[in-house]
């Protein structure tokens, strides 16, 4: 059993002897871990980390069963938020002003199930955060909810978070995407997943951005094809381009697949800033594959889009693309002419934001 297994086991048990023994015993009984011919313990994939061992589940059920029914309901709603939750969100979902008091009392008990983990403000309102003392408490409470209850509570939690953070400059877009996704509400889930992915791009959290934006694309695939749907997909895939190239390289299969789909969408849609950014992304992928002619052709398309929109930033990208492609192809005079024009119209104050969108430094080098 490698270090990754041991770290994961510890994260689920916190080193608690009973939990550790029962977790490992359950894996042995399910043959999730078994001895190899060499006598070493090995794992099968995927491991059922979320399956609570029977004896542990019985202990948790006994502890929770001793709580007042109102507090049990509070904690069940809290479990929908995850291991850490906000008391005010639970109170709003339950429409019960007594939630905060019950959680405060429970957090002070000797054998408490939750503990305070901080406070922050949502506008002028104070919000209190709690954490389940162990992830297994949260998993047990969430696991005993019916499928209908999960859908309902995820929707209520999502709409409550929307209301609490309305007008906020930094809403919890990751949480909102998760709750609407789990509630089966595809359109708001896509909206918030796109925002969460774009925020991850700005933070250079490329692997996280890829994970979130791929999920947005998967959800979009469930919707009927319309021009509005295509525009949203184009926006998602443009946001994906930079992180995919950062994680897997310019010519990775995922980046190429994303690029092919972008090409289809660009051909369908009218000129726009997003179409221009998509074409620019195509030039990056083509250029690293030494496809000089194709790079020049797509860059000229980008120049045409920029002219139709009278968009200086897109014109910089298009001229640079044509200029570099012509230079690589040995047509130095033509290449210099385009590069010179791009250099002259480049405005760092106007064009600097593109690096956050494309994952590329934009402008003269």
Predicted regions and their residues:
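Short secondary-structure boundary elements
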Residues: 2-211, 215-224
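Inter-helical turn/loop elements of alpha-helical hairpins
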Residues: 97, 140-347, 351-354
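A general secondary-structure signal for short beta-strands and their flanking turns/coil
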Residues: 125, 231-233, 359
